Amino acid sequence: MSSISIIRLQDRPELKDSLARWFHEKWGVPLEAYQESMEDCLTARSAVPQWIAALEEDRIVGRLGVIENDFHNRKDLTPNVCAVYVEEDKRCQGIAGEMLRFICRDMYARGVGTLYLLTDHTSFYERYGWTYFCMVQGDGEDSLSRMYRHVETEFPEKAVPPILK
């Protein structure tokens, strides 16, 4: 079994187009929106947006992003972790948890200690230090969704990409 590494898009900019296409196909958000956000990640000096991926050799097996707002009415709850996804054949191996830990530490190193996440899952994110914060109205949604918050309280020596074995 090969190991899984967590990488920043900034460290592997050649993955931009394949990541943008994948996110577009998975979530239905226009391809151009992902391309623009990822280009901003690569060229802007601000902490947001950010995009990471979990790689098994050259195969992308997990991904997530950090954006200002994940399509909800609480514009004050920012930035948001979005589009957390691990390929089905790689689930239950700790990859999502490692990606979440990595992005929380990486954002803390960039000066952002508090992150928000919109989800309908009721117990998954608590395992990784996220706490339920409030209910929010998703854009175009009839029902409310759960907003979680994560506050990074410790700064590790280095926010280095973890390797899973």
Where are these regions (language model features)?
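Short coil/turn motifs at secondary-structure junctions
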Residues: 69-71, 89, 122
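Conserved beta-strand in the GNAT
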Residues: 53, 59-69, 80, 85
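Conserved acetyl-CoA pyrophosphate-binding loop and the N-cap/start of the following alpha-helix
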Residues: 90, 94-102, 112
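Active-site rim helix/loop that mediates acceptor-substrate recognition in acyltransferases
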Residues: 24, 28-56, 61
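Short coil/loop residues immediately preceding or within conserved phosphate-binding loops
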Residues: 49, 76, 81, 142
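Conserved N-terminal entry element of GNAT/NAT acetyltransferase domains
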Residues: 1-17, 151-165
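Conserved active-site alpha-helix within GNAT-family acetyltransferase domains
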Residues: 109, 113, 119-143
